[in-house]
Curated annotation (Swiss-Prot):
Keyword check for Signal: yes
Protein name (record): Uncharacterized protein TP_0789
Pfam families, per the entry: LolA_like (PF17131)
Keyword presence, Signal: yes
Xref: InterPro entries: Put_LolA-like (IPR033399)
Keywords: Signal
Cleaved signal peptide residues: 1-23
Organism: Treponema pallidum (strain Nichols)
Amino acid sequence: MKRIAYVPLCAVVGGMCSMWAQSATDVMGSFKKTAETGTMGTQARMVVRKAGKTVSTLVLKQYTRYEKSGEQKTLIEFLSPLSVRGTRFLSLQKKDGAWEQYLYLPKLARVRSITGGDAHASFMGTDFSYHDLSLVGGVADLDECTLDGTESYGGKMCVRIQTLSHKPQARYVRALLWIEQETGRFVKGEFFDKKDKRVKIMTLSDYETIQGVDTPKTVVLETIAQRSTTTIHLTKVEYHMDIPEKVFTPEYLTQTDR
């Protein structure tokens, strides 16, 4: 069975064929079980549009390591435009699900920790918040999940799963996920705030098998109230990379010998 990955900026998910043979909890548990691709590197183009107009295009590279202990480490570095080139972001997920995040801005020449309310701020002017960078992995950690029927999406029959979070700090307390029944591909997610208002919609498409991993090459995150979208186009993907451990440290963010 091919693994299924949600690569850009989020955790890898998938491996969920034969949906009706599993409970919703079993399905969600598969998110983390199949996420362990070891290491991977990607290069992507992010296009931000507001009210139908393109306002920015960002190019970035990302390195991720999935530890057997359950820890996840991600480094993102921006390559263009010139105004953000050299900006680096480090995200470290601990075994207990807690996150540490750090941002390095070349103009300030310092590393700052992302804490508290900063986690819900826009990440580099995109529709992703710092919290959203771990959106899919966070969904897998929600407190409660139930099967919510089936529905056709994109011409394919999907299992719909509802997930709930009872954590007081949660930004999204409810989510609906669409997973193709035949392929196990995660193709759509809707995320709701504490007032049960639908806040964001995520879609994943253009799946391609890369080194045996079923990988979506296009991911779109829409912020409904702002009428804005951020589209991630993967241009390069490599799994099982040899990435030095020092890459995933706050100290490495300031290094220039790349």
